[in-house]
Swiss-Prot record:
Region (Interaction with major capsid protein): 508-528
Residues at the catalytic site: 46, 116, 135
Organism in which the protein naturally occurs: Human herpesvirus 6B (strain Z29) (HHV-6 variant B)
Encoding gene, per UniProt annotation: U53
Motif (Nuclear localization signal): 416-422
Keyword Iron-sulfur (UniProt): no
Protein name as it appears in the record: Capsid scaffolding protein
Keywords: Host cytoplasm, Host nucleus, Hydrolase, Phosphoprotein, Protease, Serine protease, Viral capsid assembly, Viral release from host cell
Any one GO CC term of the record: host cell nucleus
Region feature Interaction with pAP, mapped onto this chain: 270-288
Pfam families xref list: Peptidase_S21 (PF00716)
Length: 528
């Protein structure tokens, strides 16, 4: 078999990482490269027992630090070859025509699409004599932006995938790579397969893995002709034929088969039935191109349902609602009743009241509607009954309104004015309520004084003082002493690193909960 190469950027100079410790300045990279390009091992997920090859070159390009490595472990390649032969998805081949079918390369690209550089911490002064670069790893996703691993059989093919690399830089990489492979010790790959399976399981549950890979692919300017499936939509319709064998259902995919559902152009549709017919025809045409195939989301038999994409469905819904005629409410024959009059039902006494009124004023009572009685809106009670305000109820006049000097809460004059406001108020209920509040406050202060005096008396009589240790939160220095920072920094994204980044947020939330609990306890003690 031919050689398997892997290439990609270990860091991008123009992008800032999410964590400050992951920053890798260009001057630092150039300084370390001038000191001597030491051969670095290539492993899996920073596991030194899972070394699969060697790094053949590190190059300082305009876009970032580029790496070219070779996979030399035959034991590891045998595992990849067996996995690729049993995978139905890989056996179906790539949907992109320019890519040649290569199950091993596709399996490597799907399992380890990220690159990670293990380097020395910049702030650590204890590792001055040791090399800055430690090793390079292939992983599920890298922590630094733009760290995508491209696997291939030739270095030139890998370099052509990156549009951000110029032609002169490609020649520089091809001339600087050490293509002469040296002997590889197979004992370097001694990792347990269960450990690799556990790492793969942990990586699959990283929530931001696929969005991170999509962003990295855009930062590196990778073309669509790659085996990495990070840029493909997360939900894909796989056309397969189901063959039932016993209690198991075997799905056999057909290479090159695709289910293309086209969305109808709603802008040229002038009727609801035309839109539905066009969408139905599009679906029928797409199904005719797939002989002897049954999609996973096929419609049940004897059904009149039409399966449409979400965008087409909402477009049809908008067209349907937009073409409905606007309903105008009918105009009332009678004019609306104003708020000044209240219409009462007809009663027999209405005629008698009209007759009495006409006899009283010696004139006939003329009514516009003799069968209806109108009553005016009740007026304000004070005006209706001739109510007069008492002399004691006057407009409040405070001495502070006429004074030019300002006072603020806490000043003696301010408290006097507030008391004067309360004295001028003649509401007995308000005064009684304030007196009760003051009396309760005085009683509570008296109880607190009694408790303090009792505690002082007990402490004075006790010959020995017992000290109870209290649990306190560790300081930043104590945290640093208890958990020292690692001297080697691994730039692969794992669930452990994600939880570590969230630890600071959890500590601040715990402190906030503690303060809230103390405040609630104090309020409960005052209420009791």
């Amino acid at each position: 078999m031919s050689k398997v190469w892997v290439g990609g950027f270990l860091c991008v100079y123009g992008e800032e990482p999410s964590e400050e410790c992951l920053a890798l300045p260009r001057d630092t990279v150039q300084k370390e490269l001038r000191s001597g390009n030491i051969p670095l091992p290539l492993n899996i997920n920073h596991n030194e027992k899972a070394t699969i090859g060697m790094v053949r070159g590190l190059f300082d390009l305009e876009h970032g630090l580029f790496c070219v490595a070779q996979i030399q472990s035959q034991t590891f390649m045998d595992i990849i070859r067996n996995i690729a032969s049993k995978s139905k998805l890989i056996a179906a081949g790539s949907v992109i025509e320019p890519l040649p079918p290569d199950p091993e390369i596709e399996c490597l690209s799907s399992s380890f699409p990220g690159l990670s550089l293990s380097s020395k911490v910049l702030q650590d002064e204890n590792l001055d004599g040791k090399p800055f670069f430690h090793h390079v790893s292939v992983c599920g996703v890298g922590r630094r932006p733009g760290t995508i691993a491209i696997f291939g059989r030739e270095i030139s093919w890998i370099l052509d995938r990156f549009s951000c690399i110029s032609e002169s830089e490609k020649r520089q990489v091809l001339e600087g790579v050490n293509v002469y492979s040296q002997g590889f010790d197979e004992n370097l790959f001694s990792a347990d397969l269960y450990d690799l399976l556990a790492d793969s399981l942990d990586t699959s549950y990283i929530r931001k893995r696929f969005p991170k890979l999509q962003l990295d692919k855009q930062l590196c300017g990778l073309s669509k002709c790659t085996y990495i499936k990070a840029s493909e939509p997360p939900v894909e319709i796989i056309v397969a034929t189901g063959k039932v064998a016993g209690d198991q259902v075997q799905l056999t995919t057909e290479p090159g088969s695709e289910l293309a559902v086209e969305t109808c152009d709603v802008s040229v549709v002038h009727g609801n039935y035309d839109a539905v017919e066009s969408a139905t025809a599009t679906t029928a045409m797409s199904n005719q191109n797939l002989p002897n195939t049954t999609p996973l989301l096929s419609s049940p038999p004897f059904s009149d349902c039409v399966f449409l994409p979400k965008d087409a469905f909402f477009s049809l819904l908008n067209v349907t609602t937009g073409q409905q005629p606007k309903v105008v409410p009918p105009v009332s024959v009678h004019p609306p009743v104003t708020e000044q009059y209240q219409m009462l039902p007809y009663s027999e006494s209405a005629a008698k009241i009209a007759e009495q009124e006409s006899n009283r004023y010696h004139s006939p009572c003329q009514t516009m509607y003799p069968y209806w009685q109108y009553s005016p809106v009740p007026q304000y009670p004070a005006v209706l009954h001739g109510y007069r305000q008492p002399k004691t109820f006057k407009k409040r006049h405070f001495q502070s309104d006429s004074e030019d000097e300002l006072s603020f809460p806490g000043d003696p004059e301010y408290t006097k004015k507030r008391r004067r406001h309360k004295v001028d108020n003649d509401d007995d209920k308000e005064m009684a309520r304030e007196k009760n509040d003051l009396r309760e406050l005085v009683d509570m202060i008296g109880m607190l004084r009694q408790e303090i005096n009792a505690l002082k008396h007990v402490r004075a009589q006790s010959p020995q003082r017992h000290v109870v240790p209290m649990e306190t939160l560790p300081t930043i220095e104590e945290k640093g002493a208890a958990s020292p920072k690692p001297s080697i920094l691994n730039a692969s994204l794992t669930p452990e690193t994600v939880n570590r980044s969230l630890a600071g947020q959890n500590e601040s939330m715990d402190l906030l909960k503690l303060n809230k609990k103390l405040f609630v306890d104090a309020l409960n003690k005052m209420d009791s």
